[in-house]
Amino acid sequence: MNAIPLEHGLAVAGVLFCLGLVGLMVRRNILFVLMSLEIMMNAAALAFVVAGSRWGQPDGQVMFILVISLAAAEASIGLAILMQLYRRFHTLDIDAASEMRG
């Protein structure tokens, strides 16, 4: 089986990371911001796996499992905050969250 070249895997990870970063900066909806963060975390995990497979080390796969568990925790906490913001302000706009500061 032919492995994917390091350059191609890192290029895909870079494109995904940039896509998530653009979504993070452009969108004002909290749900889309959380989705953009997930895309960025998955891009970083992909870079770990590609780099680990290049040198034949299982460290990339271990980091992938760690990143996925971190992403699951981030998603659950983020969605809980999102639900509370929606219940309180009836909107998912980020500017509504700045009103919480007082």
Curated annotation (Swiss-Prot):
Where does it mainly reside? membrane
Q: Which InterPro entries match?
A: NADH_UbQ_OxRdtase_chain4L/K (IPR001133), NUOK/Mnh_C1-like (IPR039428)
In terms of domain of life, where is this protein from? Bacteria
Reaction catalysed by this enzyme? a quinone + NADH + 5 H(+)(in) = a quinol + NAD(+) + 4 H(+)(out)
Q: Where are the transmembrane segments?
A: 6-26, 30-50, 62-82
| Family listed | Belongs to the complex I subunit 4L family.
Subunit and partners: NDH-1 is composed of 13 different subunits. Subunits NuoA, H, J, K, L, M, N constitute the membrane sector of the complex.
Give the protein name, as stated in the record: NADH-quinone oxidoreductase subunit K
Q: Quick one: which gene encodes this?
A: nuoK
